[in-house]
């Protein structure tokens, strides 16, 4: 089954960014600067692409074995590892993890189980990973601590950031968390916010090159790990610039 998402183009310098999903009237102000430089999945509507855009049908989202359940605001998408469910958006030059102004990725997530060691939330090749993670691959220390983590890489070993905020507390099951990853305009520092509060950051030796020809995947990573997830995701949003701490707090208040 293929679900197509409504697309609206937005200009940013020489590039373009697109808007996925249909904003409900009470949430129009999610685009904080009004420039339309946002990619947004609200999962409320299985909408077809009814607009003529720079990328046309090439930017339709493709849903694979997912289900839709009650979310924070309307529907949310549920990924189940046993069904190998995920959502992919084919690559297009208009889809980016940031230009000169940085990038912000925010989402609400509810984890169903601690048994999966690499619960991928989003992935775009080697550029950007965000997942729910237990650090022991051999299983010897499973459950010691679990955390949200983001790993972003560039073209060489000096382009690397890794944020995992370990406060000694396990992520609670079946509880919604609001997570934000903010790459600063210099493309060197990545910050992680949990429920509107900055928790930790990581700084790269060199600015990250965030260009990637890979598809954007939600709930799955293809390649070496080929992992699937066991979680529920709502309001997945990409801003093609760096949000401030106050703007992150505002989004958290609106989407909680």
Features from the language model and the residues they span:
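Short, aromatic/His-centered strand-loop micro-motif at the edge of beta-sheets
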Residues: 150-178
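Flexible glycan-contacting loops in extracellular carbohydrate-active proteins
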Residues: 202-232
């Amino acid at each position: 089954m293929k679900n197509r998402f409504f697309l609206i183009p937005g200009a940013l310098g020489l590039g373009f960014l697109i808007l996925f999903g249909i904003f409900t009237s009470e949430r129009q102000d999610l685009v904080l600067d009004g420039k339309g430089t946002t990619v947004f999945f609200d999962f409320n509507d299985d909408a077809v692409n009814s607009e003529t855009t720079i990328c046309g049908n090439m930017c339709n989202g493709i849903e694979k074995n997912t289900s839709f359940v009650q979310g924070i605001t309307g529907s949310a998408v549920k990924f189940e590892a046993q069904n190998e469910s995920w959502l992919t958006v084919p690559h297009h030059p208009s889809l980016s993890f940031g230009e000169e102004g940085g990038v912000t990725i925010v989402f609400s997530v509810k984890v169903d189980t601690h048994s999966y060691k690499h619960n991928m939330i989003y992935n775009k090749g080697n550029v950007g990973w965000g997942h729910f993670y237990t650090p022991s691959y051999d299983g010897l220390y499973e459950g010691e601590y679990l955390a949200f983590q983001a790993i972003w890489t560039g073209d060489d070993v000096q382009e690397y950031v890794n944020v995992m905020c370990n406060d000694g507390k396990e992520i609670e099951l079946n509880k919604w968390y609001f997570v934000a990853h903010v790459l600063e305009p210099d493309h060197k520092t990545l910050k992680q916010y949990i429920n509107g509060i900055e928790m930790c950051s990581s700084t790269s030796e060199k600015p990250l090159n965030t260009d990637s020809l890979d598809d954007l995947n939600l709930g799955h990573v293809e390649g070496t790990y080929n992992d699937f997830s066991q979680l529920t995701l709502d309001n997945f949003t990409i801003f093609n610039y760096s949000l401030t701490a106050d703007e992150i707090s505002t989004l958290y208040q609106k989407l909680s």
